[in-house]
Amino acid sequence: MQYVPLRSKYKIGTRQSELALVQTESVIYQLHKFYPDIEYEVIKIKTIGDKNLLDPLANIGDKGLFTKELEVELDRNNIDFVVHSLKDVPSTVLPPNMIIGAILERADPRDAVVIAPWHKKNSLNELPHGSVIGTSSTRRIAQLKLNYPQFIYKNIRGNMNTRWEKLNNRELGYDAMIAAVAGLQRLKWNDRISEIIEPDRVLYAIGQGALGIECRHNDIDTIRMLSVLNHEPTVIRCIAERAFLRRIGGGCSIPNAVRTIYNEKGLVMDGMLLNLDGSRFVKDHVENLDLTVPMTTTKHATTFFVSNSDDELLSIEDETQLTNRSSNQRNLKRKRTESDIDSVLIPPPVQQPPTPPSSTTSATIPSITTTATLTETDVIPLLRHYAHVCGVNINETLLENAELCGTNLAVKLMQLGADSILEEIQQSSVVIPTP
């Protein structure tokens, strides 16, 4: 049975660019299919990233460059939710009272080459050596330098329209620019795409191509209203990607990249971390992971989990280990409340190991069935989420396993030397916030 919203009007926060407004209107269009009588008011807000168009993003020295001001208005209850390009939403720093309430079906996550119109060329390989390629993304620059060392890479800031104008100004010296395929297509600029770069050359950004909707974690009405927009395969992929980034650390200043595929065979995920000039990198993958099987079973122990890992999310414990733990050492386990809207964290009984979620979802929350006696100190109110994503109506085993997959892949990169690359980046001349 479809949820009936409690309000007749919702205020939507968005950036002021044409692309942001197009994306917001696309969300309103989808919502009208389910709630034709609801009114939506669009509130335009300028962010730090919109105000500072001179410095490279990595040099501004802040996370949430395109989200912070929107979150301030959300926190003040001036708006009800925000439409983001999910790649702009930090995985490591999200205000504690905010959550991603829905993720829509992902568009093409790849990067595109847009060549200046006076060049009669169709790909990067056709451009002469020394051509100037415009991009402000450290992820793109590092991978492009690795695969196309013959070019010069130059900062090109601004929204999509501004960057297009800069590319068309011959005095500025750009021969091409790199942009997300999804953004170009949403603006109906398909004819400006000269080449699409395949992920085997340039992996894409975490969440690229997906729209995420951020709201207050205690605004259950909005969360339920938005849940109809969740696209399960996209949610699962993006949770894995965001968990990967959260474990690696960093934001737009750190060249990290992914590729994910989720189908009937399971999840395939590639992850990569590079230094700023692409001369050093670590890369690994996990593949064919059946997310319907709890990751804490032995089925995945040899093919999935990292040996000698100190990461709490990746530890495997047998019943004996759990029984021998003291009460203050027990891992917290997610449990349901009698409410159908919130969940809590409570310690599991010492006598038995944690039981992974089965086929229940966030939309169906039964009563607690445990012999443990709970007190106020035992129960901690917490909205159920995975990498800050609330996947209402999606099997929670899938969501939890997707989060574990991303975390595991990040730990594998750490064991391959990601820590030393991160240290090199932090000591470089680029101003980078500590992850």
Stretch-by-stretch model annotation:
Residues 1-55, 59-60, 67, 85-89, ...:
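Small-molecule-sensing regulatory modules
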Residues 25, 63, 76, 85-86, ...:
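Short, small/hydrophobic-residue-rich motifs at membrane-helix boundaries and re-entrant hairpins
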Residues 64-78, 169:
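Short, well-structured alpha-helical segments in soluble
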Residues 72-73, 80-89:
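A short, hydrophobic beta-strand-centered structural micro-motif
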Residues 77, 130, 278-279:
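Detector for glycine-centered tight turns/loop "hinges" at secondary-structure junctions
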Residues 86-87, 94-150, 199-200, 211:
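A conserved helix-loop-strand patch within extracytoplasmic ligand-binding domains
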